[in-house]
Amino acid sequence: MAFIALGINHKTASVAVRERVAFTPEQMVEALQQLCRLTTSREAAILSTCNRSELYLEIDHPTADDVLAWLADYHRLTLDELRACAYVHQDEDAVRHMMRVASGLDSMVLGEPQILGQMKSAYAVAREAGTVGPLLGRLFQATFSTAKTVRTDTAIGENPVSVAFAAVSLAKQIFSDLHRSQALLIGAGETITLVARHLFEQGVKRIVVANRTLERASLLAEQFGAHAVLLSEIPEELANSDIVISSTASQLPILGKGAVERALKQRKHKPMFMVDIAVPRDIEPEVGELDDVYLYSVDDLHEVVAENLKSRQGAAQAAEELVGSGVTEFMQRLRELAAVDVLRAYRQQAERLRDDELGKAQRQLANGADPAEVLAQLARGLTNKLLHAPSVQMKKMSAEGRIDALALAQELFALDEGAPRH
């Protein structure tokens, strides 16, 4: 049995690679079931965000070569392409990695809170797919507990900083006064919700939310006094938009160079600020070639993010220590679990011996035997039967010269005297 955490993230792979290895929500259940069917993975969960795609596994051997091969094949990459940017963590390192990820310590934005919710969603989907069992389930629960402790006991989450916040901060650098700016937000998920909140708090003049379903767009728009439209209405909204921020789960670009070019002509080449947070990308990279367009991808936000992280660096060490404690506690409990089956079998054996002796004593009492003598025989019989198998095995080990095993038996039975002598 081994735990494995493997994948790619913003530190090891470009956005061009990450979008190729991303899983859509629609793919997730089928992918999980295929992963467990075609590899040695006994339990599995997949976390796929704009910054990382990771697989968390419980497998029956300590290598993940077949899983890497499956991941490359699933996303139509060569194995060499994937190996060039993939990482593999095993057992204690895998546990530590999961806890660091959930705590926001491995994020582009140190301490960002969204990743914990995303990991909880990954766990829920894996449960729906039937690919999470008792071991991986325990690891997820321990991970959530540690991440909660980090969040409540350190300042890692203070001074809100996220990719969404970084995008709005960058917009403020382009348009110093957002009160006169109009924003078009594409998508209606968690990241776009955060963007909308930050823009609303900055007093942006007008927000339009475009989404595949009008119902979802309207639910988000209502929170911030925004206007909701369908994706098909984006071309009409572009000309009025100073700020365009997109984050959907679409597998194909939503905005192309031609549509933006036409909008710029209507705007008389007034600057347009665009941030594509999606992986795969929502906005064709060629849009960035247009004059008067400031197009940023999620990778371009690194510099803005770094500037906003200084206040959280001091809390990072305390958070790492809490993660270390969480890892130690989980690994100890995991080792204790290894004894559960043995203890259960030992107890069942002892209970069978007890029942045999108790039945014999009850029959003797029913036949009129002296109760005191029956009790004495019960005690002697139970003692002899409980000691018989261990006694036979210890004599055998002694005859074989296995002094270390005898010393272990003394520790196991908490004996104070009679230690074997070398």
Curated annotation (Swiss-Prot):
- Chain segments annotated as transmembrane: none
Instruction: List the active site.
Output: 50
- According to UniProt, residues marked as the site described as Important for activity are 97
The family line of this record is: Belongs to the glutamyl-tRNA reductase family.
Give the matching InterPro entries.
4pyrrol_synth_GluRdtase, 4pyrrol_synth_GluRdtase_dimer, 4pyrrol_synth_GluRdtase_N, GluRdtase_CS, GluRdtase_dimer_dom_sf, GluRdtase_N_sf, NAD(P)-bd_dom_sf, Shikm_DH/Glu-tRNA_Rdtase
Function comment: Catalyzes the NADPH-dependent reduction of glutamyl-tRNA(Glu) to glutamate 1-semialdehyde (GSA).
Q: In which pathway does it act?
A: Porphyrin-containing compound metabolism; protoporphyrin-IX biosynthesis; 5-aminolevulinate from L-glutamyl-tRNA(Glu): step 1/2
Task: Give the catalysed reaction(s), semicolon-separated.
Answer: (S)-4-amino-5-oxopentanoate + tRNA(Glu) + NADP(+) = L-glutamyl-tRNA(Glu) + NADPH + H(+)
- Additional detail: During catalysis, the active site Cys acts as a nucleophile attacking the alpha-carbonyl group of tRNA-bound glutamate with the formation of a thioester intermediate between enzyme and glutamate, and the concomitant release of tRNA(Glu). The thioester intermediate is finally reduced by direct hydride transfer from NADPH, to form the product GSA.
Q: What is known of its domains?
A: Possesses an unusual extended V-shaped dimeric structure with each monomer consisting of three distinct domains arranged along a curved 'spinal' alpha-helix. The N-terminal catalytic domain specifically recognizes the glutamate moiety of the substrate. The second domain is the NADPH-binding domain, and the third C-terminal domain is responsible for dimerization.
Cystine connections: none
User: Which Gene Ontology biological process is one annotated for this entry?
Assistant: protoporphyrinogen IX biosynthetic process from glutamate
A molecular function (GO) held by this record is: NADP binding
Question: What protein name is recorded for this chain?
Answer: Glutamyl-tRNA reductase
Gene behind this chain?
Answer: hemA
SUPFAM superfamilies cross-referenced by the UniProt entry: Glutamyl tRNA-reductase catalytic, N-terminal domain, Glutamyl tRNA-reductase dimerization domain, NAD(P)-binding Rossmann-fold domains
Entries under HAMAP family matching the protein: Glu_tRNA_reductase
Subunit info?
Homodimer.
